[in-house]
């Protein structure tokens, strides 16, 4: 009984185990089935995961680039913030002042000038005090201490140097309205050669002069080397040349004889006469001749200076400027003359500036200009090497005090050329070597000299003939007398030169048109006619007497002028001078 019970129990246990095993087999089969399904699905999931990996990597790269851009933007923003902060800090700083360095002290402080005050201040360690120069600009902080060295002032007033003191650091200058002031020379002017009359740039607040100014009107008065003009180049003025040589060259070249005879050399010479007759040429030739005479006398290279001053360029609208220019002219002349060099001061158009005092219409500037010249001429007395030469075609308008003996002692009239003088002038322009027409040469045996001489003779006879075709003007004097004036009465060296130039131009045009080369007497005669015809309308002033005086006609006052020439096409003879409309130069 008991055995049956045990067997039944073992069987039941065995059945339970079999059931469990079957359950496990079933579960394993299901698990195997699941695994098989998963195994079948694995490649697809791998592909999905790979796609997701690639997508994630792309997103990561984009995020990385964006992050780098953000980093750069943040860095740039940080730099901008720093720069803005610096700008804000800089703008918030108090203003820096400027001062002028005056000098250094032994205790390390320096003296400066700023804001109209002289101050003694400290210096930043970054500034080398030993390198600071008087007059130099310095930068100041809020406490007015020097923190930086700068350059020199470049703006200021222009003043004229009157005297340089012995210490070489100070000078006496003349400002506007002839105000005198003592100033100091800044470092850039130390050692620069300065002389009275120089223009300086002054900073008026600090009292330092920084620069030498080359003013244009002063440069125009600088002494010029003498042009290469000789007496031989001047025609028709032999007697006048001899007079001026006696007045100028003899006293300079033979000063010992003049001292022995107790003869005072003339201080000046006045050359007067009609326009275009050689006054300026003579003055230049005098300087050139002096240089050559000095070279012959001393055996060394001769040198002289010619200071050509045109009257109108001296005039200045500011009071006192014209007088300053006159002082400057004579001061420069004295400087050159003190070296033993002859200096000629030549005033051209002297009547335009040194008129008779009281004759002015509006400003009467001559009331101060004339006395200035008189004092300068009188000051030349002690200088042997300065000669004053004046030129004018209206000597009657020059102040009598200038013309009196002791100032412009010698007065030389430059006359209009007569026939012989005209031949001499023509010979200066018609010289051997010019191309002459073969026909004209053949008439005189092929001789250039004979041909030119004959040409000159023909054209001079044409110019100086008192014929109907040479009648120019009929003048009526105040007493009622009338006189006919011919072109020869208004001839000049300048007109002769113009005639020769016209003839040469005609010869050139003929050669270009016909191929026939050379100057002919017909060219000279035609040029003479053209020159006369052009002069028909020139006497155009409404005051006949003034025009006559400028043209060299003196004597009875002229009240009426009538033209007699009818050289131009369309012009009529016998017109009153008041009806002439065209303008032109004086004859």
From Swiss-Prot:
Full protein name: Proteasome-associated ATPase
Organism: Thermomonospora curvata (strain ATCC 19995 / DSM 43183 / JCM 3096 / KCTC 9072 / NBRC 15933 / NCIMB 10081 / Henssen B9)
Gene3D superfamilies reported for this sequence: 1.10.8.60, 1.20.5.170, Nucleic acid-binding proteins (2.40.50.140), P-loop containing nucleotide triphosphate hydrolases (3.40.50.300)
Keyword field: ATP-binding, Chaperone, Coiled coil, Nucleotide-binding, Proteasome
Role played: ATPase which is responsible for recognizing, binding, unfolding and translocation of pupylated proteins into the bacterial 20S proteasome core particle. May be essential for opening the gate of the 20S proteasome via an interaction with its C-terminus, thereby allowing substrate entry and access to the site of proteolysis. Thus, the C-termini of the proteasomal ATPase may function like a 'key in a lock' to induce gate opening and therefore regulate proteolysis.
Lineage: Bacteria, Bacillati, Actinomycetota, Actinomycetes, Streptosporangiales
GO molecular function annotation: ATP binding; ATP hydrolysis activity
Domain notes: Consists of three main regions, an N-terminal coiled-coil domain that binds to protein Pup and functions as a docking station, an interdomain involved in ARC hexamerization, and a C-terminal ATPase domain of the AAA type.
UniProt cross-references to SUPFAM superfamilies, sorted A to Z: P-loop containing nucleoside triphosphate hydrolases
One Pfam family here: Prot_ATP_ID_OB_C
Pathway(s) of this molecule: Protein degradation; proteasomal Pup-dependent pathway
Family under the similarity heading: Belongs to the AAA ATPase family.
């Amino acid at each position: 009984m008991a055995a049956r019970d045990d067997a039944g129990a073992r069987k039941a246990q065995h059945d339970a185990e079999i059931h469990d095993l079957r359950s496990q087999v079933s579960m394993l089969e299901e698990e195997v089935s699941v695994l098989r399904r998963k195994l079948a699905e694995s490649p697809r999931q791998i592909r999905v995961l790979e796609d997701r990996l690639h997508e994630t990597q792309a997103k990561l790269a984009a995020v990385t680039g964006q992050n780098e851009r953000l980093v750069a933007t943040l860095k740039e923003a940080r730099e901008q913030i720093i720069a803005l902060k610096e700008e804000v800090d800089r703008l918030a700083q108090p203003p820096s002042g400027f001062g002028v360095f005056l000098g250094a002290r032994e205790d390390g402080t320096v003296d400066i000038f700023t804001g109209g005050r002289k101050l003694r201040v400290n210096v930043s360690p970054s500034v080398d005090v030993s390198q600071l120069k008087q007059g130099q600009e310095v930068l100041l902080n809020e406490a007015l201490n020097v923190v930086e060295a700068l350059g020199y002032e470049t703006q200021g007033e222009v003043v004229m140097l009157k005297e340089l003191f012995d210490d070489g650091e100070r000078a006496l200058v003349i400002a506007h309205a002839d105000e005198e002031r003592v100033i100091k020379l800044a470092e850039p002017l130390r050692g620069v050669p300065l002389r009275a009359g120089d223009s300086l740039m002054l900073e008026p607040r600090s009292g330092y002069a920084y620069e030498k100014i080359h003013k244009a009107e002063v440069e125009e008065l600088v002494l010029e080397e003498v042009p290469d003009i000789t007496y031989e180049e001047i025609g028709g003025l032999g007697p006048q040349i001899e007079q001026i040589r006696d007045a100028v060259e003899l006293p300079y070249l033979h000063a010992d004889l003049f001292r022995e005879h107790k003869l005072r050399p003339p201080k000046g010479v006045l050359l007067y006469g009609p326009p275009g007759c050689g006054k300026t040429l003579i003055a230049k030739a005098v300087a050139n001749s002096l240089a050559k005479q000095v070279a012959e006398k001393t055996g060394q290279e001769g040198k002289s200076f010619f200071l050509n001053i045109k009257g109108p360029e001296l005039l200045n609208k500011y009071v006192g400027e014209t007088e300053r220019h006159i002082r400057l002219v004579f001061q420069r002349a004295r400087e050159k003359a003190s070296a033993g060099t002859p200096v000629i001061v030549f005033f051209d158009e002297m009547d335009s500036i040194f008129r008779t005092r009281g004759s002015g219409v509006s400003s009467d500037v001559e009331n101060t200009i004339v006395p200035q010249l008189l004092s300068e001429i009188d000051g030349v007395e002690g200088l042997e090497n300065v000669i004053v030469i004046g030129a004018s075609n209206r000597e009657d308008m020059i102040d009598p005090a200038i013309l009196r003996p002791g100032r412009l002692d010698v007065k030389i009239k430059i006359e209009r050329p007569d026939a012989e003088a005209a031949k001499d002038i023509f010979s200066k322009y018609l010289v051997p070597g010019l191309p002459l027409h073969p026909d004209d040469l053949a008439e005189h045996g092929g001789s250039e000299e004979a041909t030119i001489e004959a040409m000159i003779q023909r054209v001079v006879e044409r110019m100086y003939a008192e014929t109907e075709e040479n009648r120019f003007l009929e003048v009526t004097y105040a007493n009622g007398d009338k006189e006919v004036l011919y072109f020869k009465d208004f001839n000049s060296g300048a007109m002769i030169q113009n005639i020769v130039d016209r003839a040469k131009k005609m010869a050139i045009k003929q050669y270009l048109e016909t191929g026939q080369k050379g100057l002919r007497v017909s060219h000279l005669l035609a040029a003479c006619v053209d020159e006369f015809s052009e002069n028909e309308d020139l006497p155009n002033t409404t005051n006949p007497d003034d025009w006559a005086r400028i043209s060299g006609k003196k004597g009875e006052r002229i009240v009426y002028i009538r033209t007699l020439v009818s050289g131009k096409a369309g012009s009529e003879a016998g017109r009153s001078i008041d009806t002439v409309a065209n303008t032109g130069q004086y004859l």
